[in-house]
């Protein structure tokens, strides 16, 4: 793996200014970012995007680019069908995320479909997920953006928690690609080697995180076997990007 594959990430900079985050990336010599639209850095919802011009100027000044854009679900749910208000606003939000990624010169949109309901039919919610992701892929393709989907943890959702479910989704929505997040993969008992064996070049980004049963951590604050995970990642022929949350 090359050093340039390891990209900076603002995931743990939610309570720091954009300047503080970008200054840190410059010191670490990170020229590419996995960027989350955190309110302190970029405001983004289904109605508007605020701060894009400021962000773009700040990135250009430091010669930093965005390699992947990671919108969080917040109050939106890809498990809602487009016949409901929440479902329509969700679709609008993710389309705006595509627009924002394209405006930043970023061709990879990574989504984490959290928020399935426990007391609603899993079959219905799965159909809604397929509809939403397929529609988003079609829209993103028009803007030169690739949609990538990751699994989520038990605390985040009752669906799409395993590699098996993700494989099913990618079979039903072949235009989508994958993100490997070590936290939900670990909770599901899945290895990095297993993921690459199943998905290969479909994996476009790796969120290489430490964690505990209650979620992700900066490396050293969780319980995951760093050396084992690192060795597995080095063994696979992966040329995509890797984000280390907290860097």
Residues of each region from the PLM?
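Histidine-acidic metal/acid-base catalytic patches
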Residues: 1-7, 15-29, 60, 105, ...
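Residues at or immediately flanking beta-strands
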Residues: 32, 65, 144-148, 177, ...
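N-terminal pre-domain/capping segments
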Residues: 1-106, 175-177
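Alpha-helix initiation/capping motif
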Residues: 45-48, 83, 122, 159, ...
């Amino acid at each position: 793996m090359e050093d340039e594959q390891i990209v900076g990430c603002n995931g743990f900079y939610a309570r720091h200014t954009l300047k503080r985050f970008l200054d840190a990336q410059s010191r670490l010599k990170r020229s590419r970012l996995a960027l989350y639209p955190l309110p302190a850095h970029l405001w983004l919802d289904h109605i508007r995007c605020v701060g894009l011009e400021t962000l773009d100027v700040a990135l250009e000044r430091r010669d930093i680019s965005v390699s992947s854009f990671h919108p969080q679900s917040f109050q939106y749910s890809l498990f809602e069908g487009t016949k409901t208000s929440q479902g329509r606003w969700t679709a609008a939000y993710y389309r705006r995320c595509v627009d924002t990624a394209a405006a930043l010169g970023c061709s990879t949109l990574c989504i984490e479909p959290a928020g399935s309901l426990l007391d609603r039919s899993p079959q219905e919610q799965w159909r809604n997920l397929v509809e939403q992701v397929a529609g988003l892929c079609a829209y993103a393709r028009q803007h030169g953006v690739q949609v990538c989907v990751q699994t989520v943890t038990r605390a985040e959702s009752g669906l799409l928690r395993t590699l098996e479910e993700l494989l099913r989704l990618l079979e039903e929505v072949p235009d989508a690609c994958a993100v490997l997040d070590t936290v939900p993969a670990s909770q599901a008992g899945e290895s990095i080697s297993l993921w690459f064996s199943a998905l290969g070049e479909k994996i476009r980004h790796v969120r290489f995180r430490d964690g505990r049963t209650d979620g992700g951590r900066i490396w050293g604050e969780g319980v995951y076997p760093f050396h084992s995970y690192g060795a597995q990642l080095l063994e696979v022929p992966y040329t995509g990007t890797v984000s280390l949350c907290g860097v």
